[in-house]
Design a protein with these regions (language model features):
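Inter-domain helical "communication" segments and dimerization helices
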Residues: 1-95
Length: 96
């Protein structure tokens, strides 16, 4: 189930607005953790466009979930790139 802010009577619009906030926060956090600024903002903008094109609540939630997964993966990649060779080898060995 989605989180329905009480600001609007339109559930889909409220969820879209909430998703936009989530995408912005994810982009900012990703940049703080080392993701390329341009890539973070372009991804955010693409997710917002996809979010606006969604016509049902499940579609909006799917776009939001895909954004969360995308930024989580990108943050993970960024973190692994900054590991020392020894730590990288250990992470690869244990399969993280």
């Amino acid at each position: 189930n989605g989180i329905i802010p009480s600001v609007s009577g339109d559930t889909i619009r409220s969820e879209k607005n909430y998703s936009i906030i989530v995408f912005e926060k994810l982009a900012q956090t990703s940049i703080t953790l080392g993701m390329d600024i341009i890539e973070a903002y372009q991804s955010r903008d693409a997710l917002i466009q996809e979010n606006e094109l969604a016509v049902s609540l499940p579609e909006v939630l799917k776009v939001r979930d895909s954004g969360i997964v995308y930024y989580t993966k990108e943050i993970g990649k960024t973190k692994i790139e900054h590991l020392s060779p020894l730590i990288s080898s250990v992470v690869q060995f244990i399969g993280l």
